[in-house]
Amino acid sequence: MSEDKVVDVAVGVLIRENGKVLLSSRPAGKPYAGYWEFPGGKVEEGETVHAALVRELDEELGIKLADSFPWFVMEHRYEHAHVRLHFRRSREFIGDGQAKEGQEFGFFGAEERTPGLLLPVDQAIIKRVDLPDVWEDSTEILTLSENALHATVVRDRKYRFVGTRAGTLDDVLKAVAMDFDFVIVKPELFEASLKNGEPRLPTYVEGVPAADLRVWQDKGAHGVKPC
């Protein structure tokens, strides 16, 4: 494989009503065999990311995916491949799963999401699964200066997540560089950012009603922060 070739991969974050999320182990014969991950696979030529995810979940686990919506995209360079990971969330699927490739799998809650070693990328971002769909006002806001990058930091009161507000596309890129868990933006900035592709971080759209949550999630937002 060419060192410069980027492989697009569809990644499914399937969440049950009780908040448990699907994880599976990588089967023997694949790189990182035995490591756990969010399931998914390579996007074939001519496929949408959603279509690739539908196919992969059926082939690997016998799960029928009804719908999914974009969450965020990130790139990672492994020893064997340079991948662009398109994370998509779904609560609309049928089936409990089958080990079609001899892998282990299960739905895990927040306190049990380490059934084994996780892939490095998944280990880094798995707590983002628990970000609420609606960001409430009960947050602490302060100013951070780190490596000459300035940002307004937003934390939930339990200090589980650290995010930032972004007023420009440049601010969004800074948030990615500073490895924040999420970013809060105005609707017009979110719309403008989509011209550059899928969000690079879980994104809250600020100043819109909670009733419009699914509208914004269908566009790629993680959630909303009401007025």
Spans of features found by a protein language model:
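NUDIX/MutT-family hydrolases
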Residues: R89, G97-V129
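Active-site-adjacent beta-strand/loop module that shapes the phosphate/pyrophosphate-binding cleft
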Residues: R16, M74-D96
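A short coil-to-beta-strand element that immediately follows conserved catalytic motifs
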Residues: K64-V73
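Active-site-adjacent beta->alpha loops and helix N-cap segments on the catalytic face
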Residues: L144-R160, T168-V172, V185-L201, A211-D212
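Conserved N-terminal beta-strand and adjoining loop/helix that marks the start
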Residues: M1-V21
